[in-house]
A protein has these predicted regions:
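Active-site acidic catalytic loop and adjacent metal/ATP-binding pocket
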Residues: 1-21
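Short amphipathic alpha-helical segments and their helix-coil junctions
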Residues: 4, 8, 50-61
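Short, conserved loop/turn and helix-capping segments at secondary-structure boundaries
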Residues: 13, 17, 43, 97-100
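Secondary-structure capping and boundary motifs in well-ordered enzyme cores
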Residues: 15, 71-72
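Active-site activation/catalytic loop segments of kinase-like enzymes and analogous catalytic loops
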Residues: 20-57, 74-90
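A general structural signal for well-ordered secondary-structure junctions
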Residues: 33, 59, 113-116
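All-alpha amphipathic helical-bundle segments outside canonical DNA-binding/catalytic cores
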Residues: 61-71
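ATP/Mg2+ or Mg2+-diphosphate-binding catalytic cores
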Residues: 78-121
């Protein structure tokens, strides 16, 4: 905020191939708001994320055209990982099992968006 650092995102473990996959993972993790049991996409957060990202690295038109499929892929990845853990982790395990339905909802939202501009407006 202002001239103060308010956060750092380490993209190293997100991916090392497609830079837009980094954005897709961040959108899924940071750009949804929860209202009771429902998730809603927050396009203002997406715009701010992209603005900050592009202050360092410009996003090409080709990359922009891949945003939707990468967001869906990232949501599917987390949904399936959580679903596996939900169904296969013993009740006695000392880890917190996360609800896979969160990422199912996000996947449905991504399926209703198609273009890069759909994420911003």
């Amino acid at each position: 905020k202002g001239n103060e650092l308010s956060g750092i995102i380490d993209f190293y473990f997100a991916a090392n191939d497609y830079f837009m996959y980094e954005i897709a993972i961040c959108i899924n993790a940071l750009c949804f708001d929860k209202h009771k049991t429902k998730f809603r996409i927050n396009k203002r957060k997406i715009m701010n994320l992209i603005k900050g990202y592009e202050s360092v690295k410009k996003i090409s038109e080709k990359e922009k055209s891949s945003l939707n499929i990468l967001c869906r892929g990232a949501a599917m990845r987390y949904f399936l990982t959580r679903l596996y853990d939900f169904t296969n982790t013993p009740k006695t395990a000392l880890i917190k099992i996360k609800d896979p339905k969160e990422y199912y909802q996000k996947l449905v939202i991504h399926n209703n968006l198609k273009t890069y501009k759909d994420y911003l407006k």
